[in-house]
Amino acid sequence: MINNYLERQIKENFPYQPTPEQEIAVKSLSEFLLSPRSEVVFMLRGYAGTGKTSLVGALVRTLDKLQQKSVLLPPTGQAAKIFSAYAGHPAFTIHKKIYRQQSFSNELSNFSVNDNLTTHTLYIVDEASMISNEGLSGSMFGTGRLLDDLVQFVYSGQGCRLLLMGDTAQLPPVGEEQSPALFADALKGYGLEVVEVDLTQVVRQEQQSGILWNATRLRQLIAEDDCYSLPKIKVSGFADIKVLPGNELIETLNSCYDHDGLDETIVVCRSNKRANIYNKGIRAQILWREDELNTGDLLMVAINNYFWTEKEKEMDFIANGETAVVRRVRRTRELYGFRFADVTLVFPDYNDFELEVNMLLDTLHTDSPALPKAENDRLFYSVLEDYADITVKRERMKKMKADPYYNALQVKYAYAVTCHKAQGGQWKNVFLDQGYMTDEYLTPDYFRWLYTAFTRATGTLYLVNYPEEQIV
């Protein structure tokens, strides 16, 4: 009886007539929410265009109406902004919610798993394909295993449960072969009962989309393990996917920037080296920026930084992959064989929060994701020499951990990024450069890369310099 009422309420909040698959999902969700067992997790796997976001949005609005507690937990700040918008409900990053800072006598803070003081609350995690469970050596967070810590946090609260949603065709976390948070056996390993629902049918409203037509074909090829020849991309008959010759790139990018803004346009590349070439060209030939760093420059954080936000409430730390806009550039200087700048940044995904940082300029140009290890070590030992007069090692390390140069923020330009950096985000205009393809690149990883890149676009996908034999 109550099940039927809950199902009706969710359907009433649905923006359109549910598909048969969505009907099953609504029924399963209602049973999950009303189950007397608390040691149960709901896994909603859905491909692009199958309506999983609409379904969860309807669920959240229903819970709000019934005054039942829910917390939205995406993995990144940008994903939080997107999730909050479609669910009409505040969203927090996983790290912000499940970890708390621990300070040790002026040393750099660590983060331990928080106490879950909520009761009978549904925690909804979007973009769960991005959640890693690889133990990270030297991690500042809990056990270093995000999925372990998430499960521990949620189920330590009385009557609390977890709903994981994501897309198994997307790229798994770096260094992992699959996304553990969308793999039932991984969750059963915590002693949890797993309710699984898969959405595979593209909803009628999305069937005219060339982006989704091709994304659907790509994930079918992944499922069939047919990933060893160049996939054909269907462009004819679709308005949202275009082939772009290289000689039209600058004009088209410029038009997108003028029409939709820098923050709604992105270039996705195969490598950091290729992204660097794009970023250099875009800044010089489209934005006419002559200085290394200008007011208005769009940046992406290259590595987690805990130093500059230690005394800030708005951000616990500056996460790898977060975007920032340069508000002001003040002093630049060269020290230890590296270049630094005092910069005021604005973080658009955190209500335009403003922060003063010391920035390492060298990473803007490296072909690696962040400062290479050898360079990082060189910086460490160069700064350490400044404290050579301190004989007690522990005291020397304290000074290092409080040093603004050793803790300088590492960033890259954000006009062009790799696909892993783009994951979790959405843009109206996505320019996709897959680079020169050889047979050795034709693997399931490439197909997942392509699928993930395709599904970043909400408006138009531009295929830059695509070979004619790949287009139909």
Residue ranges and their predicted role:
Residues 2-16, 45:
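Conserved adenine-nucleotide phosphate-binding loops and their immediately adjacent elements
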Residues 4-6, 25, 29-30, 37, ...:
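Conserved helicase motor core of P-loop NTPases
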Residues 18, 72, 267:
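Conserved SAM-binding loop
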Residues 22, 76, 271, 424:
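Short, conserved phosphate/pyrophosphate- and ester-handling motifs at nucleotide-, phospho-/glycolipid
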Residues 26-27, 31, 36-229:
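ASCE P-loop NTPase helicase motor core
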Residues 39, 77, 331, 412, ...:
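Catalytic phosphate/metal-binding cores of nucleic-acid and nucleotide-processing enzymes, i.e., regions
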Residues 335-472:
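C-terminal accessory regions
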